[in-house]
């Protein structure tokens, strides 16, 4: 007999860059703030939007990947479970926090150049080194193919254009 199901699926956009921390044992814990927006019509037929903010945590290897590639404004798909925790604050008051513990993550709406920096790329050194890693492999395979023009870069927007 099943004891219950705790499954959460979210598709949304990051409200800020990931917060990356490490345990004493070296495990990565990455926390993001993810916005999801639902749309419905009210009694008068007017469109109403409601945005919910979710605190999502990634652990271990998934935390490393999320911290490396997700950025403010990035869109992603997340599967995980919901967790409610209670703690005592510095003022002695009991506080409650609701978090999504991610088991799976898929980046959506990313850049076509393989950089994965969907939200603006504030770590250009890593992005550049990744492009260098990819370039020799592509060139090694292309001589047998007819010459093709490369797709235009998608750097034609600024972080200020993203509403998050």
UniProtKB/Swiss-Prot annotation:
Regions of compositional bias (Gly residues) in chain numbering:
111-122
Q: Where is this region: Disordered?
A: 105-164
A Pfam family recorded for this sequence? SSB
Q: Name one GO cellular component term.
A: nucleoid
Q: Where is this motif: Important for interaction with partner proteins?
A: 159-164
Source species, domain of life:
Bacteria
Keywords, A to Z, come to:
DNA damage, DNA recombination, DNA repair, DNA replication, DNA-binding
Tell me the ranges covered by the SSB domain, including all copies: 5-109
Secreted is among the record's keywords: no
Any single biological process term in GO: DNA recombination
Q: Which InterPro entries match?
A: NA-bd_OB-fold, Primosome_PriB/ssb, ssDNA-bd
SUPFAM superfamilies, sorted:
Nucleic acid-binding proteins
Instruction: State if DNA repair is listed as a keyword.
Output: yes
An example molecular function term from Gene Ontology annotations:
single-stranded DNA binding
HAMAP family on file: SSB
How does this polypeptide assemble, per the annotation?
Answer: Homotetramer.
Q: What does this protein do?
A: Plays an important role in DNA replication, recombination and repair. Binds to ssDNA and to an array of partner proteins to recruit them to their sites of action during DNA metabolism.
NCBIfam families from the UniProt entry: PRK08763.1, ssb
User: What protein is this chain from?
Assistant: Single-stranded DNA-binding protein 2
**Gene encoding the protein:** ssb2
